């Protein structure tokens, strides 16, 4: 969190992608936890965008009803402000993935996504985007181009080192603001060489 605050203080950070090299690394849980931490003060409006259109899970995790969201915004021109809901008592806002009928990857490559992201970042103090894993899909890369920074979530003892290296290479060192080691006590020695990457 301190790293994010430093970047924010320098005016370099307002929007984030949270992704992982492989599935089941805990990126969605990290996304929700980060949104909660950033919203704790109550003075900033935090939006979590569920951009995993392939396997949306946040509604079920939060125990709320699934409703139209990002997919419908991109596919049918739905006003995002009509789909965003406040998550109480966590004090942050959510734009669900929705249930669009089109190809998920193609939707994230549409020309309307940059304008949508610009609108959201001008409305909210923080915009956190939970995307699918970096490989084998290109979804995370499509969204990463439109945000200020990326946080990469690794599952200690599970995420293969070669896949981590590949994900970092695809995202680029200038885009990755940090690595989050999920399920680890301290920095796992297997991944220590990546600590200075960003």
PLM region spans:
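P-loop NTP-binding module
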Residues: 1-198
